[in-house]
Curated annotation (Swiss-Prot):
Enzyme superclass (EC): transferase
GO BP terms: rRNA base methylation
Tagged with keyword Nucleus: no
Catalytic-site annotation from UniProt: 394
Protein name: 23S rRNA (uracil(1939)-C(5))-methyltransferase RlmD
Length: 436
C-alpha cells in the first residue's frame, strides 16, 4: 500500500532587525540605514534604538514596526487618544507636533528644490490646532450578536475589525457631543442588523447626520430618528439602497470669505475649517489678484476657491468633473450674487480642446487636483500661456511629477508652503506658485 506524502507547511518566521533611527520622514516613520539599505520604521523617532519586526522588504528599502525600545527619545510624547495604535485614523500622536510639521516641510522643500537651480522661497507653514480640527467623521456600525449591542467606531489599522469609540480627539466638539447620544439612540433601534454607517458633518447651521441602512425602515425607527434630530438640532439624512433623503432640517453650509457655500452631506469638502480658510486666503494673496484678471480654477468642486477669487477679478471660470458639483457651484454663485463666474463640467483626464471655456484667455490658473494629480490637464493647460499657476496639492509625489511638466513649459517655482491640514496623520498638503 502506497503512502501519500504530504509536506508539512513551513512555519513563517518573524524577521527582526535592530535599528538606530537617524531621521523622520513626512509620514511619521523613523528612517534608519542598515548595511546600505534604507528602513522605514513605524513608531520610531530620531535618536532611538529599536528592535523592530519586518513587515515588508524590497531590494532597496524595507518596512518594519518598532516592538522594543533599546534607547528611547526624550522627545517622545504620550498619545492622548485611548484608541491610538488600534484605530487607523492617526499615525503620529507619539511625535511632537512641531517635529511632525518640520518633517513634512522638509520633505516638501527638498523634493521641489531638486527640480531647479534657482532658489525657492519656503514660506511659513500654514498650521492650526493639533486637536478638534475635523468637521467630518464616518462611523462604522456593527451588530454584536454576542453582547446584543450595536458597536460604533472606526476600523482598526490594517483590518476590517471595529474599534468602538466614545470620542475622537481630532473631531470638532460638536461631533463629540453627539457620539454618546448616538450610542443611546442605536440601543433603541428595532432592526440593528440593518444599520450600515453614520456620517457626521459639523456645519455653520448645526451638525448634519447621514444614517445608512439596508432594507426597509420601520416606522418606529423613523420616529425615533426624527425625534433625535429634533431634540439635538441635527440636519438628518437617511440613505437606503437607492437614494439619500433629507428628512429633517436643512442642507448644510459653511461660510468662507463672507460667502455661504451649501453642500450635500456626501459632497467633498475640506474637513479642516480653519485651515481651509487660511489656505484660500494664501491662494488669493499669492495669485496677486486684481480687477483685470481672468482666472481659471480646475477641479473646483462647488466653488471653494472659485467664488472667493471671483470677487476680486474681472472673470472666473471653474471646471469640475462631477456634474452634480458643478450644479452646486452654480447655485452657490447665484445665492451669493456673484455674476462674473461660470462653471463647466469636464473630465480633466480627457481632451478638452473642444470645450468652449478652453478658447478663453486666462492669465492666471489655480488647480486643486485629487491625489492622482493633474498630469494630463497640465500638458494641455500650459498651452494657454497663463503667467502664473497656483497648485494646491494633497500628494507630494504627484506634485513633483506635475512640477516637472510645468518646468518643461517654462514655468519656475517661486514659492511653496506646507499646509498641516491633518495633524497626527501621514498626509502632506501644500501650496506652490509657478510663474512663467
Amino acid at each position: 500500500m502506497a503512502l501519500l506524502y504530504a509536506p508539512q507547511k513551513k512555519q513563517k518566521t518573524t524577521q527582526k532587525i535592530v535599528a538606530e533611527i537617524q531621521d523622520l520622514d513626512y509620514q511619521g516613520l523613523g528612517v534608519a540605514k542598515i548595511q546600505g539599505k534604507t528602513w522605514f520604521i513605524e513608531n520610531a523617532l530620531p535618536t532611538e534604538k529599536v528592535e523592530a519586526v519586518v513587515t515588508d522588504e524590497k531590494r532597496q528599502y524595507g518596512l518594519a514596526t518598532a516592538q522594543k525600545w533599546l534607547q528611547e527619545s526624550s522627545q517622545r510624547v504620550e498619545p492622548q487618544c485611548r484608541y491610538y495604535g488600534r484605530c487607523g485614523g492617526c499615525q503620529g500622536q507619539h511625535i511632537p507636533v512641531e517635529m511632525q510639521r518640520k518633517a513634512k516641510e522638509k520633505a516638501l522643500f527638498s523634493r521641489l528644490s531638486k527640480l531647479q537651480a534657482e532658489p525657492i522661497q519656503l514660506m511659513p507653514m500654514i498650521c492650526g490646532e493639533q486637536w478638534a480640527y475635523r468637521r467630518r467623521v464616518r462611523l462604522s456600525l456593527l451588530w454584536n450578536a454576542k453582547s446584543k449591542t450595536v458597536e460604533m467606531g472606526f476600523r482598526q489599522k490594517n483590518s476590517n475589525q471595529l474599534v468602538s469609540i466614545q470620542q475622537c480627539l481630532v473631531a470638532e466638539q460638536a461631533i463629540n457631543d453627539l457620539i454618546p447620544k448616538l450610542t443611546s439612540l442605536l440601543a433603541q433601534y428595532s432592526a440593528p442588523k440593518q444599520l450600515g454607517h453614520i456620517e457626521l458633518v459639523s456645519a455653520e447651521n448645526g451638525v448634519a447626520m447621514l444614517l445608512r441602512y439596508k432594507g426597509n425602515l420601520a416606522e418606529t425607527d423613523r420616529t425615533l430618528l426624527l425625534e433625535f434630530a429634533r431634540v439635538n438640532a441635527v440636519n438628518l439624512f437617511l440613505q437606503d439602497d437607492q437614494n439619500i433623503q433629507l428628512v429633517h432640517g436643512e442642507m448644510p453650509y459653511y461660510a468662507l470669505d463672507d460667502i455661504r457655500l451649501s453642500f450635500d452631506i456626501r459632497d467633498f469638502i475640506q474637513v479642516n475649517t480653519r485651515l481651509n480658510q487660511q489656505m484660500v486666503e494664501t491662494a488669493l494673496d499669492w495669485l496677486d489678484l486684481n480687477q483685470d484678471d481672468h482666472v481659471l480654477d480646475l477641479f473646483c468642486g462647488m466653488g471653494n476657491f472659485t467664488l472667493p477669487l471671483a470677487k476680486r477679478v474681472k472673470s472666473a471660470v471653474g471646471i469640475e468633473g462631477v456634474l452634480d458639483m458643478v450644479k452646486k457651484a452654480q447655485a452657490n454663485a447665484q445665492f451669493n450674487h456673484i455674476e462674473n463666474v461660470e462653471f463647466y463640467q469636464a473630465d480633466l483626464d480627457q481632451s478638452f480642446s473642444e470645450q468652449p471655456w478652453s478658447k478663453q484667455h486666462f492669465n492666471k490658473i489655480l488647480l486643486d487636483p485629487p491625489r492622482s494629480g493633474a498630469a494630463f490637464a497640465l500638458n494641455a493647460l500650459c498651452e494657454l500661456g497663463a503667467e502664473s499657476i497656483l497648485y494646491v496639492s494633497c500628494n507630494p509625489a504627484t506634485l513633483v511629477r506635475d512640477a516637472e511638466i510645468l518646468r518643461s513649459f517654462g514655468y519656475r517655482i517661486i514659492k511653496t508652503a506646507m499646509i498641516d491640514m491633518f495633524p497626527n496623520t501621514s498626509h502632506l498638503e501644500s501650496v506652490t506658485l509657478f510663474i512663467k
